[in-house]
UniProtKB/Swiss-Prot annotation:
Dephosphorylates CDKN1B at 'Thr-187', thus removing a signal for proteasomal degradation. Residues 110-133 are annotated as: Disordered. It catalyses: O-phospho-L-seryl-[protein] + H2O = L-seryl-[protein] + phosphate; O-phospho-L-threonyl-[protein] + H2O = L-threonyl-[protein] + phosphate. Residues 77-506 form the PPM-type phosphatase domain. It comes from Rattus norvegicus. Keywords: Cytoplasm, Hydrolase, Methylation, Nucleus, Phosphoprotein, Protein phosphatase. The keyword Nucleus applies. The modification Omega-N-methylarginine is found at residue 212. PANTHER family: PROTEIN PHOSPHATASE 1H, PROTEIN PHOSPHATASE 2C. The modification Phosphothreonine is found at residues 113, 223. This is Protein phosphatase 1H. GO terms for biological process: signal transduction. Gene3D superfamilies: PPM-type phosphatase domain (3.60.40.10). GO terms for molecular function: [pyruvate dehydrogenase (acetyl-transferring)]-phosphatase activity; identical protein binding; phosphoprotein phosphatase activity.
Length: 513
């Protein structure tokens, strides 16, 4: 096993140094190369590229920055720019999509097919959708949707997620659309129940009568349901959060089901934003990042999920289910690899229940390869993958073994909410979404400084200003090709990864409040 792990680590390091086609986030899984693709590879639909332009964009030497040809293709005058990697993989494995979704109440039985009521629009006037409020029950509720997917070990999962995740989101929102329309009434515990309007004196039913189901008891035909036990009050935004979490899970399950019929390679991180009823819901699974820049202030809207940030979750899972380690790994963390000559000595270690460090006596099991190895961007789960949440990766195994890594990976996103109605936003207040290709070389502060320097120098009425701002960020992260590779400010190493950036102006959210 030690030889296999050393080989995996060597392959990874060699890929980084030589710019191999291997992914920074993980190794390749079992491919279905003889199977048809679920969807053909391409760049985001809203870029409006021809096939020739797609091929020209895949120049790993020139690395041309792609931007929107027509700003009306994205709502809110959203800016977008992207660039391919410096040779890490053949294709740009990032994917993006942006749509306006219309959610209508589900009619009839629940089906497993994508929601037909979701209206996909690839070309939208800048002002369209600014008054996104329900007009009637038949029209449902409209919401804006932006997404970024960072693929690894192939673009298959990212392409599929960019085409289908919005359908799962729409489907999950269908059950609650009528509840969301009426913000004055708390969501019922059970769908179909009427809101409680019974006066206080009508709720004095005894516990015995309640259990017998007598007149006035819950479920009796003569009165609305009466609650003997206290119930949690669930706010409306928690329903939306739950819908997004469920949609991510369903998307991951669909990839798992369909990989036997289609070639869906690798996995992907997922970062999405839904603007619904005056609130931004930012859901992230992976190491992409979202920040709001408001009046120069930085407001983080996501967390990154890596072997280091999720160490305790991963260690606890391995502790509870040691068979997942294949008798080849230890769930304990040590400052460095344990050597056989150190058996019987006391060494610093850290377990799932610890944020600090303690000493333990080294045993034979401690000589196994650690579940989490490396630091920072080089940290890996089982020496294989550097991101712990996302979609896909169902066939990913430890190099030259039958140990699956998927049990340690989660599709669950973290969802954060931003209420647009609480602030009056200016033309320079924006939400930045970007894959890790940007954040690997630029800090939140550097991105905020770039935005606050760039936007004030643009005409506030210029519809291209946010696209130009996105282009500026990508250019700052990519840098300039010199004798020693791509270099950015202060002669630092530029990003050799795929980079995708949205710049979403929040001033349009003022009209939704």
């Amino acid at each position: 096993m030690l030889t296999r792990v050393k080989s995996a680590v060597a392959n990874f390091m060699g890929g980084i140094m030589a710019g191999s086609s291997g992914s920074e986030h993980g190794g390749s899984g079992c491919g279905g190369s003889d199977l048809p693709l679920r969807f053909p590879y391409g760049r985001p639909e809203f870029l409006g590229l021809s096939q020739d332009e797609v091929e020209c964009s895949a120049d790993h030497i020139a690395r041309p920055i792609l931007i929107l040809k027509e700003t009306r293709r994205l709502p809110w005058a959203t800016g977008y720019a992207e660039v391919i990697n410096a040779g890490k993989s053949t294709h740009n494995e990032d994917q993006a999509s942006c749509e306006v979704l219309t959610v209508k109440k589900k009619v009839g039985t629940i089906t497993s097919t994508p929601n037909r009521n979701s209206k996909r629009r690839s070309s939208l006037p800048n002002g369209e959708g600014l008054q996104l409020k329900e007009n009637s029950e038949s029209e449902g509720i409209s919401c804006h949707y932006w997404s970024l997917f960072d693929g690894h070990a192939g673009s298959g999962a990212a392409v599929v997620a960019s085409r289908l995740l919005q359908h799962h989101i729409t489907q999950q929102l269908q059950d609650i659309v009528e509840i969301l329309k009426n913000s004055a009434i708390l969501p019922p515990t059970c769908l179909g129940e009427e809101p409680e309007s019974t006066p206080a004196h009508g709720r004095t039913l005894t516990r015995a009568a309640s259990l017998r189901g007598g007149v006035g008891a819950p479920g009796s035909p003569s009165t609305p349901p009466t609650r003997f036990f206290t119930e949690k009050k669930i706010p409306h935004e928690c329903l939306v959060i739950g819908a997004l979490e469920s949609a991510f899970k369903e998307m991951d399950l669909q990839i798992e089901r369909e990989r036997s019929a289609y070639n869906i390679s690798g996995g992907c991180t997922a970062l999405i934003v839904v603007c619904l009823l005056g609130k931004l819901y930012v859901a992230n699974a992976g190491d992409s990042r979202a920040i709001i820049i408001r009046n120069g202030e930085i407001i983080p809207m996501s967390s990154e999920f890596t072997p280091e940030t999720e160490r305790q979750r991963l260690q606890y899972l391995a502790f509870m289910q040691p068979h997942l380690l294949g008798n080849e790994f230890t769930h304990l963390e040590f400052p460095r690899r344990v050597q056989r000559k150190e058996l019987g000595k006391k060494m610093l270690y850290r377990d799932f229940n610890m944020t600090g460090w303690a000493y333990k006596t080294i045993e034979d099991d401690d000589l196994k390869f650690p579940l989490i190895y490396g630091e920072g961007k080089k940290a890996r789960v089982m020496a294989t993958i550097g991101v712990t949440r996302g979609l896909g990766d169902h066939d990913l195994k430890v190099h030259d073994s039958n140990i699956y890594i998927k049990p340690f990976l989660s599709s669950a996103p973290e969802v954060r909410v931003y209420d647009l109605s609480k602030y009056e936003h200016g033309a320079d207040d924006v939400l930045i979404l970007a894959t890790d290709g940007l954040w690997d070389v630029l800090s939140n502060e550097e991105v905020a400084e770039a935005i606050t320097q760039f936007l004030p120098n643009c005409d506030p009425d210029d519809p291209h200003r946010y696209t130009l701002a996105a282009q500026d960020l990508v250019m700052r992260a990519r840098g300039v090709l010199k004798d020693r590779g791509w270099r950015i400010s202060n002669d630092r190493l530029g990003s050799g990864d795929d980079i995708s950036v949205y710049v979403i102006p929040l001033i349009h959210g003022n009209k939704l409040s």
